Amino acid sequence: MPRWLSAPEHARHRTVAASAGAPWTPRRVAMIAVHTSPLEIPGCGDAGGLNVYVAQIARRLASRGIDVDVFTRATRRDLPPQQRLAPGVTVRNVVAGPLEPLPKDELPVHLCAFTAAVLRAEAMREPGWYDVIHSHYWLSGEVGRVASQRWGVPLVHTMHTLAKVKNAALAEGDVPEPGRRVIGEADVVAAADRLVTNTWTEARQLVDLYGAEPDRIRVVPPGVETAIFRPGDSARARRRLGLPIDGCVVLFVGRLQPLKGPDIAVRAAAEFLSTHPGMRSTFRLVIVGGPSGSRSTEPERLRALAADLGVADAVIFAPPMPPDRLVEFYRAATVTIVPSHSESFGLVALESQACGTPVVAARVGGLTTAVRDGESGLLVDGHDPARYAGAIGRLLDPGLRAELVRGAVAHAMRFHWDNTVEGILGVYRDALAERRTAATQRLASRVG
C-alpha cells in the first residue's frame, strides 16, 4: 500500500474535518452539475446519486450561512432561469443546446455555450463573487477549470464515476466510455486544486489510473438522510404497496442500465424460484427505476427477460420515487440487491441499510465501503445470478437476517450528510488557504 494511503497517514494528514477551524470559510460557492439537476428525482434518465449528493451538500452549506448557486443545463422549455432548491440555494438553469434531455455523449459540444453562460452570470456580479467552484462529473469539471482560471478561485472536483474504471468492468450490452471523456477527466485531474473521492479505493484509482497528485486528494464519504430513511413497520409498508405480507421481497433501486445490473436481479429471481418453488406465490422482485437516457430500451428488455425466464408474474416494475415514497419500498423489502458492475459508492445500499433492510451487493468499488460484509449485508464476488440467489436464500434464516438488520442500521448511522458537509467545508478551506498563501508569497517575492 502506498504510504499516503496508509491508515496512520490518513489520520495524520487526510482527515479533512481536522481543518474545520481554519479561517478561510467561503461566503459563496458555485456548484456545477452540467448533465443533471439536483431537482430531478433519482432513478431515471441521468439522475442518480450525483443529484442526491449535490442537493444534500448544497442545502447543508446554505444552513451554515454559505450561499450556493448550482449551474445545470436546462432540459425543458418551461424551466425558469432560476429555481430555489432551499433557502440560500439557487439552481440556475443554463441554456446550452436544445431544450431537451440529451445523452451524455452529446453534451461535450455544448460545453462552450454552457461555460460562456456561467461566466456571464458571474460577470454581472461584483468582482470576487464566488470564493470556490465545486464541479461534479467530468463534464462539469471542464467548465469548472475554465471558470477557475478566469475567476482566480480554487476548483474542487468530485468525479463520481471514472471512465477507465467503468471500461474495465463493462456489462453485457454496455458500450465503452469514449476517449473524449478519458482525456477530459485527465485534464480535470491536472487542473483541480482538490479532488474529492468517496472512498480510498477511488482515491487509489485516481492516482494509479490518472496520475493524480496524492496531496491534492481528500476522501469524504457521502451520507444518508436519516430523517427520512429509518426503520419502520414492514408489514404496514407491504400492505400499502400491495406486496405479500409473508414472503420474500427483493428490491432493486436505480437507473435501468446494464451498468447497474438489473438483468442480474431478474436472473437471480429466476434462480431463486428454481430452488424455492414453494415460495412462488409469495416471492416478489420489485424494480424501482426508469430508463437511463431518452433512447434506452432497457425496461422493455428486462420485461422480455422476465417473461423468457418464466418469472414475469413475480417481477414488479415501479417508476422512480421521491425519498418520502421510496422509504416505503425499503421498509417492505426483505433484502435490497445491488449487483452493479461498477459503483463509486452506492447510496442505494446506504439508504436501504438505514431502513433496516440488509443488502446483497457486488464486491466492487465503493460498495465494499457502503456494505460491511457479514455485518450489514452480504457481498458477492462476480456477477453470477446463482450466487446472488444463494445470498438471498441465506437471508431466509431468521437468525442471520435479524443480525444483519441490526448491523445494517448501525453501519448506516456512521454515515451522515452533516459529517460529509463538514468534510467538504474542510476541503474548501484547505484549497482557499493554499491559494491565498501562494498569492501572498508571489506578492512578497515581487516586493522583495
From Swiss-Prot:
InterPro entries: Glyco_trans_1, Glyco_trans_4-like_N, Mycothiol_biosynthesis_MshA. GO terms for molecular function: acetylglucosaminyltransferase activity; D-inositol-3-phosphate glycosyltransferase activity; magnesium ion binding. It catalyses: 1D-myo-inositol 3-phosphate + UDP-N-acetyl-alpha-D-glucosamine = 1D-myo-inositol 2-acetamido-2-deoxy-alpha-D-glucopyranoside 3-phosphate + UDP + H(+). SUPFAM superfamilies: UDP-Glycosyltransferase/glycogen phosphorylase. Keywords: Glycosyltransferase, Magnesium, Metal-binding, Transferase. One of its GO terms (biological process) is mycothiol biosynthetic process. HAMAP family: MshA. This is D-inositol 3-phosphate glycosyltransferase. It comes from Acidothermus cellulolyticus (strain ATCC 43068 / DSM 8971 / 11B).
